[in-house]
């Protein structure tokens, strides 16, 4: 195993398709997340519309928003799960950490082909472009500043994965904090007008989403702490030990899901 072998293997047609499909799943999950938040907020706003007439319709509208948000959240989780599975499969096939052989199941292959066939022009651009091109693509996913050999090459890829995932999560955390601050401001402003119990009822969807997101971040930072610890141990014990790389890869896969 060397950095050169990884560069060749990652640009094989099937691996490029897998990376493209994983990116599409993550992007779709992100869009669904915005829709879920939007529906939760809309449900909250509906609860404060004038209800002298048509109060039943307003209540039904609020409930429909919550139900639709729930269904979209299920689809979001499925997309995110597929993306994490595809990224794991890509790393298994390209890095071969803890596994010498890698085979793509029929179910995974059909999923990848279906996603790639949906937008053929976009797919063609993505597999042709690298991350530094415009628009950024999936070619040359792992780029090396120098030549690495053996387990050092595998560890360098894991280091890049840990950095990318951390950067993405910081952006999401900032968005969640901003949303929470805006929500708290709205609650304090509206509570004297509508009453605290009305506020609580209208906030059910948003509160469930915030609890879900808080749970995700707690798990994320627990895994990040473990990842940092294992990476530090590997850095202090060169060349990287195969068993330590397997443990690190498992933690990275858990954090993606």
Predicted regions located by residue number:
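Membrane-interface amphipathic/juxtamembrane segments adjacent to transmembrane helices
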Residues: 9-14, 70-115
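Short, non-transmembrane cytosolic segments of multipass membrane proteins
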Residues: 1-5, 103-149
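Membrane-proximal, non-transmembrane alpha-helical segments
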Residues: 6-19, 132-176
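Alpha-helical transmembrane segments and their immediate juxtamembrane boundary regions
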Residues: 26-79, 170-226
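Charged, amphipathic alpha-helical oligomerization/scaffolding segments
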Residues: 85, 89-92, 96, 154-157, ...
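Sequence termini and other peripheral, non-core segments
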Residues: 1-49, 53, 86-89
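Cytosolic/matrix-facing juxtamembrane and C-terminal tails of multi-pass cellular membrane proteins
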Residues: 2-17, 21, 214-257
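Solvent-exposed, non-transmembrane helices and loops of integral membrane proteins
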Residues: 91-126, 231-257
């Amino acid at each position: 195993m060397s950095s050169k072998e990884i560069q060749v293997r990652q640009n094989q047609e099937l691996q490029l398709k897998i990376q493209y499909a994983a990116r599409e799943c993550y992007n779709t999950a992100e869009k669904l997340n915005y829709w879920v938040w939007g529906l939760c907020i809309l449900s909250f706003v509906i609860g404060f519309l004038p209800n002298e007439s048509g109060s039943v319709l307003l209540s039904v509208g609020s409930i429909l928003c919550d139900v639709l948000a729930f269904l979209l959240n299920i689809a979001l989780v499925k997309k995110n799960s597929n993306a994490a599975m595809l990224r794991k499969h890509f790393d298994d096939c390209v890095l071969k950490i803890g596994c010498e052989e890698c085979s793509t199941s029929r179910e995974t292959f059909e999923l990848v082909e279906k996603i790639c066939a949906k937008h053929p022009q976009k797919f063609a651009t993505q597999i042709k472009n690298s991350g530094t091109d415009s628009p950024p693509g999936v070619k040359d996913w792992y780029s090396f500043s120098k030549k690495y050999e053996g387990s050092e090459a595998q560890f360098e890829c894991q280091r890049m994965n840990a950095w990318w995932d951390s950067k993405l999560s910081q952006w999401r955390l900032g968005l969640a904090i901003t949303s929470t601050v805006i929500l708290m401001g709205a609650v304090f402003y509206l509570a004297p007008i509508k009453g605290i119990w009305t506020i609580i009822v209208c906030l059910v969807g948003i509160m469930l989403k915030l609890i879900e997101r808080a749970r995700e971040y707690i798990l994320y930072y627990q895994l990040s702490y473990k990842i940092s610890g294992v990476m530090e141990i590997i850095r202090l014990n060169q060349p990287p030990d195969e068993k330590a790389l397997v443990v690190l890869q498992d933690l990275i896969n858990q954090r993606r899901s």
